[in-house]
Every structure is written in structure tokens, then in C-alpha cells.
């Protein structure tokens, strides 16, 4: 029959409602039609059945509804006729039941296991009050323990069923609007109801635990402090419930009751976690109020005070719980005065970002960029910073805290409203994902899983909008909400600061006081908060468009800069750069319209002194901070192409000074490009060294060409050919930012020209080149060092090829032969340069190898260098050049092996340390493991040495001690975090191991 106890008069065929097809109902199960017929829902065309079918089609997953309905039909305990009749006539029941079955497989299984629970969803259903919840749970265990034969766990199944029934009712009311025209429950109401259910459940768990442990004895006084989302009454459907126990006496009996309570609750309801207690899982489970006070006064970290923001006395002895809160909450609001508060907050901010594995970062609702943790962490931090002086911020829930921050002027009211809306949307999705299987999760479906995305959209009551289907609308909404949270996250911290110092046109009309602004800046990592405020004030109070644009930009820029190792230095550099480029309209427009450029620039400014100084005079490099079609624009310029452009540009000038100025200009731009790419992790250290060598070589060539042009009248022929031989790291193409250029000059008289005349002219040219390049300027210095030439400073600056050959054959010391190992022709006459190298080969790679006496002399010299050349006061463990396992150790070791074996192994005829190490490994001269030790030490020391120049802006070889500067060096060297101590430990470990092998080669 069509409807129970209802006489149905069939309409004529022309008046019957059209029964929708299985496909139109959104049913994809191949047995769907069969199951509909089994239930009797597909046999009639009357309005009741058609309405029921359309209700089914609106469920988030109609197939997921149908499967448990068939199981209920088949279960005699269901009372199918009663249920079916109710579904046909009770639209509210239909909406609630179909919505919950289409959204939660787990609650569907619960309903099948307890088929009479469907009756909880019919009629006028409302959420039970806190009192009703406590009564229901109390009644469930009212007679527990009356019978001495009761097993301790006999009550658990009843409690589990009751708890799931409460979730069923709440979820059904929460979801009903997805199927029928039912009221939408606000997120805050759902989260608070979940917390109320947890309160009642935990109170019952405590009662059961007391009965199991104490029997008829008086139980100990025990308070259960709710923490986390439970404490804030913003609980998820599936959460670990965080607790702290406080006892009148922290004795074994109290501990047993607490342990038993956790066990009962975990088995009947949800996972209970006491990990937020003092000392975490290693600490005592139960403490007295006095013990808690002592711990928080002496040992607690900032994150532990942050966790207490959510503390609430929820279960057990109320007086004891309130005493605990009264004692500890004043410490929470004073936490920002602690000496290590800023450092710990910075560490927490970075830890939040590092928690998410890269492969799921885009799917993370909680920990991803623009996710829930961004909101929660920001809100809690602002509460900690300002709650000391403003009791209106002493609230536990995130939504209430956002409202209080808006009312107090700590964030804009509109921003607070927008952030609340985004937060509630993301929490709604989190709830829907957890409901599906009653599992703790905050991972969105994989983007390619269209079915899962569509289900989530429908469960979240998202419908097609004409341009996209429900899944497409969800994707767009997620993107928009994440973006809004990311943008507001920065604005949250910094916009009110601008109001406290900026013009009245800014959006917040009642910004925080200057004292509060300084306090907040200090918390965010700005050590000189007063000075920082002055810089910010100077930027936003500029007249006209510039000040307005800075007011818009600064919240985001300051936030990004706060993650850099030196925010104070970065802010000063940003102010100087902005003032220097005040006439350039593209500058602020680029930062406004291209967030990737702005973010990278803030990192560079907050890490380096060297690069910002270059950007002042080569600002066009900033425009290369973005990405092109082929990747980062900073990598588009090839070093060889830059070198050719530099030589060509300098060649346009007849005046050597102007030519050198042109060369400096292009070098400046190239140094800014390479330094920026290095700081942003876009270049390997070997690529950096080659690029720096390339530009140095180009400058040498440009300078030599310019001076020769100036000293040759038009049409005259040069009296000599000149070649520049690169030595040291220049010859090995391994220059760093602070390296000078070790060179030697060689000449060859032109036909018919006397040696004396050629040498006089060549010496004048070489001296002029060196003097021009050494001329002081605002750019990094161009120091040319020719002291490796024969006889050093006492010898002539230029020699003929024959004179070099004679000197090396007759007078050269072992160290001079060693220096030739890195000789390479870099500029000037290429043919002459190659002939010099052929001559040098006979000296550095003699047919029978170097003598044993020469090897002993080199070892003695190495010992003398270690004893005498290390600067006074330098730490030998952390001196990157001359320290233990530093650059000199590795290079001398490699060169000694070249001297001993290169006559037999042409592969060792290399000027590069790294290439020589590769050849040593290939020839099996030493074990590969030892080669790797040397290689890693050289790379580590080179990165550190380069980073020192980038950070300090001047040449230095000594790593600083622990502190902000060491942190900056770590970041500049490519260390994965800004923990300078970790970086230093790694440096010491790598260089110590390398030094062990170096001692084997040279002797201790």
C-alpha cells in the first residue's frame, strides 16, 4: 500500500507525478533500483513517495543513505513499517535521517547496530540542555556498582551507545538543512554542544572510575581541567580531549582514579590526552594546586602558558578547579614579560609552519597556509601580548577572542568579522570530514578525487552556482578563504600598529596605544621596537600616494620580515630602499601587485647587509625577484652573457675611469643578482663561486682593455702582449663574495721591441689596472693582489714568459710551485696565457713528481701557517679559512696529493679544489668516504664564509657566537632553519671529521 492506514485514490495517468529515474536521484550503485524496490519506494507515483525520493537525492551521498536503509529494512528490530510510514509523512525526520546517513558512514553503522535509535530523530527534535545531558549520562550508570558481581567494564557498551546517540542527534540537526528546509545550526552552537556532551560524558567517566577504584569509600577530591578545544567549548566531532588533573592530595589513590577515568572515557567516548600537564608524558599524572604553581613559576615554557588560555574547570571538584585557575591565570597574562618570551614565540611560529609535510600542505585544513592554526595561533598570541592590561581578552574560545580583539581595537572589526567567517567555514569542513568515519582528520580529499570533493561540498551545504558544480564552488571557496586568512593573518598583527602611529585615514579608528604597539612588535621579533615604530611611522606618514600604499603594504611586509633572522635590520633596509626609490613608480606597484617579489625581498632585507646596499644602486634587480615562464627570473641571466655585456659596455668608453665605472655598474648588478639568488636558495654554492669568478674575470678584462686603449695612440701597435694569470681561488673559479683577485702579469715583446721597453710599458699598464681597480668606491672592493709573483712584493710586477720559466726552474720555493697548481689564464692575450700554462705544467707536474724534500717542506710550511697566520683572538674551531678543517686545510691536502700524483694522473691537472677531489676519488688515491669528508668540509666552510659576507656586508672569516647574527649566517648559508646553534654544531662536526683526515696526511 502507498501509505500506512491511508486509503490512496490513484490519479488518472495524466495527473500522476513523474517518478524520477535512478540516475536523476544521483544513485550510482548498480543495485540501487533493486534496493529502492525492496524498500517499496519505487513502486508508487504518489506525492509522498516522490517527495521521499527527491529528499533522498538531496543527501550528500544518496547511495550511502540507501545501503543502511536496506540493512534497517532487513532487521526485524527496526520496526520498518513504523519507520517507513514516518519517513513518508515526517519531512523533518526525512531530512535529519537522510542527511546524517549520507554524511556519516560511522553513524550509519551505529544506527544499524541500534535500529531503535532512529526514533530519536522524529518529531520536534531539539538539542538537549546541559542539565538534560548530565541526567542522561547519570541514568545510564545509575545502578552501576550496586551488584558486587558487576564487571568493571560492564557499563562501557551502554555509555558508548548513549554517546553515539547524542552525536547522532546533534549531527542530524547539524546536517538536516542539506536535505530539507531546516534551520542551520551555527558552528559555535555545534562546537559548544559537543563540549557539553563531553562534559557530561567525562563527569560520568569520573563517577564510574571512582566506583571502580574506591568502591564504597569516599573518593579523593579531584578536579578535571578541560584544555584545548574542549576547554574553549569549541570541540570537534572527533578530537583528542585534553585534560589536566588537580587533586587535593597527589597520592596513589588520586592517581588511580585519574588513570581509570582516562581509560573509561577513552574506551567509551573519545581519546583522552593528559600530555599538556607539567612535564608532559614524563610528568606526574596528578598534582596539587601548589605543585602546579611551583612548576609554572619555575619551569614552564611559553607554549604551556599559551595552552592555559583554554583552561576551564569542567568536571569534578569545582572549588578545587577554580582555585587552580585563580592561581595560574595571572601567570598566563604575565607570560609576555618573561625574558625568553619573544624567542619562544618565534620558535613556535616557525614550528607551526614546519609541521606540515610538503606533499599534503595543499590539503591541510589545520596546519596549511591560510588554515585553522594560522587563525588560532595569531589570536592566542595577541591575547598573550595584550591580555595583561585588558581583561576583555580573558576569553577561551577563538571566536569570542576575535570579537574581543576587534572591540578592543587590536584588530579591525571588519577584519575580525571576516576572519571569524573564514574560521567557521574551515571548521565546518573539518567537522564534515570527521563525521564521515568518526575519525580525527583535517585532510581535504585529493584534488583528483572528484567524488570525494563533491560529497564534501554537498555535506557542507554547498550548491552549484551556474558557473561551477558543487565541487567547483567548494574549490573556489577554499581558495578564497585560505587567501583571506593568509592576508588577514599578517594584517592582524600589524594593521593596528599603523593606526597607532599613522594618519587618521587608516581603517581602524581606535588603534592600540604606542606602548601596546611596541609590546606587540617586540613579541613578533623586533628587538628595537621603539626604533621600528619610528621607521614604520616614517613610511606610512609620507605625503600623497606613497604613504597610502605603504599603509596597505606594510602589514604583509612586516609579517614576512618578522620571519627573517634580523627583522630590525630588514626594516631599516626597507626604509632606506623605499626612500632611495621614492621617485620610482614601479617600486611600490611591484611590491603591491607581485606578492612573490615582495616576500622574497623581505627575506633578503631581513637576512643580509651586503645585498640591500647593492640594491640601492641596482634596484632593477628587484624586478627579477619574480618568476618567469621558465622559472625564477634571477636565474635567467647566464654568467657568460653577463661577462660579455660587461666587457662590451666598458669598451664603449675611451676614458679608463669611465670604462671602469661602467664595469662596476654591471658588476654591481650581477653581485646583487647572484647574492639575491643565493639568499633565496636558488643557486648552489658551486654556481655562486663560478658566477662570482666570471664577473671578476670580466672586470679584469675590461680594465686591461681600457688601460691599453688609453695608452695607445690611434693606430699604434702595442709594444707587448699582456696576459693575466689567475691564481688561488680566482684560478680555481672558486671565488667568494669577499675574495680578492690573486693574479700574475706576464708579457711578451712585440716583434722588434726590446725586452726592457716591453717590460716598462707592460709594467705601466699592469700598475694602472691595479690602481684603477683599487680606487675606493661605494661598491664591494676590487682588490687585486699580485703578491704570489716571483719574489713577492720585492719582485717586478710584470715578467716575460722566459723570465718566469727561468725563475721557476732555478729559484722557486716549494710553496711557489704549490701556488702554480691553481694558475689559470683569465684575461689578456689568450695565446700568451696558454703558453704560460704550458710552462707552468712542467713545474707543477714534473715528469718524476716533486721531491720528497719538497713534500717535507710543504708539510713544515703547513704547520707554520697553522701556528702563525691565524689572527690573534680568533677561534681555531670556527675560522672558516685557517681554522681546523677549514678551507686552507682542505686545499692544502688536495694540493699535496696533486704534487705527489699528478705526474702519473693527468686527471689531477685541475685548478678547482672540488674537481681535483673528484679526480682523487676516481683514481682511488684515498677512500671515497674520506674524499666525501673533505668535500663536505670545503662546501660547508665555503657556504659559511660566503654567508658571513652576505650577512655582515664585509669580508670576515670568523663565525660569530650564538645569537641573532649566527642565526642569520645559518639562513644565508642555506641551513633549513634559523637555529644558529644547530648550524654551528653541524659546522664543527663536519670540519672536525675532515681535520682528522688532514692530520693523517700532514701529521699531527
Swiss-Prot record:
Entry protein name: Bifunctional glutamine synthetase adenylyltransferase/adenylyl-removing enzyme
Region (Adenylyl removase): 1-497
Keyword terms: ATP-binding, Magnesium, Multifunctional enzyme, Nucleotide-binding, Nucleotidyltransferase, Transferase
EC number(s) reported in the record: 2.7.7.89, 2.7.7.42
UniProt enzyme class: transferase
Cofactor(s), names only, from the UniProt record: Mg(2+)
GO biological process: regulation of glutamine family amino acid metabolic process
Biological classification of the source: Bacteria, Bacillati, Actinomycetota, Actinomycetes, Mycobacteriales
Species the sequence originates in: Mycobacterium leprae (strain TN)
Disulfide pattern: none
Amino acid at each position: 500500500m502507498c501509505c500506512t492506514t491511508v486509503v490512496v485514490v490513484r490519479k488518472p495517468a495524466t495527473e500522476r507525478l513523474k517518478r524520477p529515474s535512478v540516475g536523476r536521484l544521483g544513485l550510482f550503485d548498480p543495485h540501487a533500483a533493486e534496493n529502492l524496490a525492496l524498500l517499496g519506494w519505487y513502486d508508487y507515483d504518489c506525492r509522498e513517495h516522490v517527495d521521499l525520493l527527491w529528499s533522498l537525492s538531496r543527501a550528500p551521498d544518496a547511495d550511502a543513505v540507501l545501503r543502511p536503509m536496506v540493512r534497517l529494512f532487513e532487521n526485524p528490530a527496526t520496526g520498518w513499517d513504523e519507520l517507513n510510514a514516518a519517513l513518508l509523512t515526517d519531512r523533518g525526520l526525512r531530512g535529519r535521517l537522510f542527511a546524517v546517513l549520507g554524511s556519516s558512514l560511522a553513524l550509519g553503522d551505529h544506527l544499524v547496530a541500534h535500529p531503535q535509535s532512529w526514533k530519536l530523530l522524529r518529531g520536534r527534535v531539539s538539542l538537549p540542555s546541559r542539565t538534560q545531558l548530565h541526567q542522561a549520562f547519570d541514568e545510564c550508570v545509575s545502578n552501576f556498582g550496586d551488584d558486587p558481581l558487576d564487571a568493571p567494564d560492564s557499563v562501557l557498551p551502554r555509555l558508548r551507545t548513549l554517546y553515539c546517540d547524542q552525536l547522532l542527534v546533534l549531527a542530524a540537526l547539524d546536517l538536516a538543512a542539506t536535505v530539507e528546509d531546516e534551520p542551520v545550526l551555527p558552528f559555535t552552537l555545534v562546537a559548544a554542544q559537543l563540549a557539553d556532551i563531553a562534559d557530561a560524558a567525562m563527569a560520568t567517566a569520573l563517577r564510574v572510575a571512582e566506583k571502580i577504584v574506591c568502591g564504597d569509600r569516599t573518593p579523593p577530591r579531584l578536579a578535571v581541567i578541560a584544555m584545548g578545544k574542549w576547554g574553549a567549548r569549541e570541540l570537534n566531532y572527533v578530537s583528542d580531549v585534553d585534560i589536566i588533573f588537580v587533586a587535593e592530595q597527589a597520592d596513589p589513590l588520586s592517581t588511580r582514579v585519574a588513570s581509570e577515568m582516562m581509560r573509561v572515557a577513552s574506551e567509551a567516548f573519545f581519546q583522552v590526552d593528559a600530555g599538556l600537564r607539567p612535564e608532559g608524558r614524563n610528568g606526574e599524572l596528578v598534582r596539587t594546586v601548589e605543585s602546579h604553581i611551583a612548576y609554572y613559576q619555575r619551569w614552564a615554557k611559553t607554549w604551556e602558558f599559551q595552552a592555559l588560555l583554554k583552561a576551564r574547570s569542567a568536571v569534578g571538584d569545582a572549588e578545587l578547579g577554580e582555585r587552580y585557575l585563580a592561581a595560574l591565570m595571572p601567570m598566563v597574562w604575565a607570560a609576555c614579560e618573561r625574558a625568553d618570551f619573544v624567542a619562544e614565540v618565534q620558535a613556535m611560529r616557525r614550528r607551526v609552519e614546519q609541521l606540515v609535510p610538503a606533499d599534503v600542505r595543499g590539503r591541510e585544513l589545520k596546519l596549511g597556509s591560510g588554515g585553522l592554526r594560522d587563525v588560532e595561533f595569531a589570536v592566542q598570541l595577541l591575547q598573550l601580548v595584550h591580555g595583561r592590561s585588558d581583561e576583555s581578552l580573558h576569553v577561551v574560545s577563538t571566536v569570542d577572542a576575535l570579537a574581543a580583539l576587534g572591540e578592543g581595537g587590536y584588530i579591525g572589526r571588519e577584519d575580525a568579522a571576516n576572519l571569524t567567517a573564514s574560521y567557521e567555514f574551515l571548521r565546518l569542513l573539518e567537522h564534515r570530514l570527521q563525521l564521515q568515519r568518526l575519525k580525527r582528520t583535517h585532510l581535504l580529499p585529493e584534488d583528483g578525487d572528484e567524488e570525494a570533493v563533491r560529497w564534501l561540498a554537498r555535506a557542507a551545504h554547498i550548491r552549484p552556482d551556474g558557473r561551477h558544480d558543487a565541487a567547483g564552488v567548494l574549490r573556489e571557496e577554499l581558495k578564497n578563504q585560505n587567501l583571506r586568512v593568509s592576508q588577514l593573518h599578517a594584517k592582524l598583527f600589524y594593521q593596528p600598529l599603523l593606526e597607532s602611529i599613522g594618519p587618521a585615514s587608516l581603517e581602524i579608528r581606535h588603534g592600540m596605544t604606542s606602548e601596546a604597539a611596541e609590546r606587540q612588535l617586540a613579541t613578533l621579533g623586533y628587538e628595537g621596537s621603539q626604533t621600528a615604530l619610528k621607521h614604520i611611522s616614517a613610511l606610512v606618514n609620507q605625503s600623497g600616494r606613497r604613504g597610502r600604499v605603504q599603509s596597505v603594504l606594510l602589514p604583509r611586509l612586516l609579517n614576512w620580515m618578522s620571519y627573517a633572522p634580523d627583522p630590525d635590520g630588514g626594516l631599516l633596509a626597507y626604509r632606506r630602499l623605499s626612500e632611495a626609490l621614492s621617485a620610482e613608480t614601479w617600486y611600490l606597484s611591484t611590491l603591491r601587485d607581485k606578492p612573490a617579489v615582495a616576500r622574497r625581498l623581505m627575506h633578503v632585507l631581513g637576512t643580509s647587509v651586503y645585498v640591500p646596499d647593492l640594491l640601492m644602486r641596482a634596484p632593477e634587480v628587484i624586478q627579477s625577484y619574480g618568476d618567469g615562464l621558465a622559472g625564477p627570473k634571477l636565474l635567467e641571466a647566464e654568467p657568460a652573457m653577463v661577462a660579455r655585456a660587461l666587457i662590451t659596455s666598458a669598451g664603449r668608453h675611451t676614458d679608463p675611469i669611465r670604462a671602469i665605472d661602467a664595469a662596476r655598474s654591471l658588476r654591481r648588478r650581477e653581485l646583487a643578482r647572484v647574492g639575491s639568488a643565493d639568499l633565496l636558495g636558488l643557486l648552489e654554492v658551486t654556481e655562486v663561486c663560478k658566477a662570482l669568478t666570471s664577473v671578476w674575470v670580466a672586470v679584469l678584462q675590461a680594465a686591461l682593455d681600457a688601460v691599453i686603449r688609453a695608452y695607445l695612440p690611434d693606430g699604434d701597435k702595442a709594444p707587448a702582449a699582456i696576459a693575466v694569470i689567475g691564481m688561488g681561488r680566482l684560478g680555481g673559479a672558486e671565488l667568494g663574495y669577499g675574495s680578492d683577485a690573486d693574479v700574475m702579469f706576464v708579457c711578451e715583446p712585440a716583434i722588434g721591441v726590446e725586452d726592457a721597453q716591453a717590460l716598462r710599458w707592460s709594467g705601466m699598464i699592469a700598475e694602472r689596472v691595479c690602481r684603477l681597480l683599487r680606487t675606493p668606491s661605494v661598491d664591494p672592493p676590487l682588490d687585486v693582489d699580485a703578491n704570489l709573483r716571483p719574489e713577492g712584493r720585492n719582485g717586478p710586477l710584470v715578467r716575460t714568459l722566459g723570465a718566469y720559466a727561468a725563475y721557476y726552474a732555478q729559484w722557486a720555493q716549494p710553496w711557489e710551485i704549490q701556488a702554480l697548481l691553481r694558475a689559470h689564464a683569465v684575461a689578456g692575450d689568450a695565446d700568451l696565457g696558454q703558453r704560460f700554462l704550458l710552462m707552468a705544467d712542467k713545474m707543477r707536474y714534473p715528469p718524476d713528481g716533486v721531491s720528497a724534500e719538497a713534500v717535507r717542506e710543504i708539510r713544515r710550511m703547513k704547520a707554520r701557517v697553522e701556528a702563525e697566520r691565524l689572527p690573534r683572538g680568533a677561534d681555531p674551531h670556527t675560522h672558516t679559512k685557517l681554522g681546523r678543517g677549514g678551507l686552507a686545510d682542505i686545499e692544502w691536502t688536495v694540493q699535496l696529493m696533486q704534487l705527489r700524483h699528478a705526474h702519473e694522473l693527468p686527471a689531477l691537472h685541475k685548478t678547482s679544489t672540488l674537481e681535483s677531489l673528484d679526480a682523487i676519488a676516481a683514481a682511488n688515491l684515498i677512500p671515497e668516504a674520506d674524499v666525501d669528508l673533505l668535500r663536505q668540509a670545503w662546501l660547508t666552510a665555503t657556504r659559511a664564509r660566503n654567508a658571513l659576507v652576505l650577512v655582515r656586508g664585509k669580508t670576515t672569516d670568523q663565525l660569530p657566537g650564538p645569537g641573532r647574527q649566527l642565526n642569520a649566517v645559518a639562513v644565508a648559508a642555506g641551513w633549513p632553519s634559523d637555529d644558529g646553534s644547530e648550524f654551528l654544531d653541524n659546522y664543527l662536526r663536519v670540519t672536525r671529521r675532515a681535520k682528522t683526515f688532514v692530520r693523517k696526511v700532514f701529521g699531527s
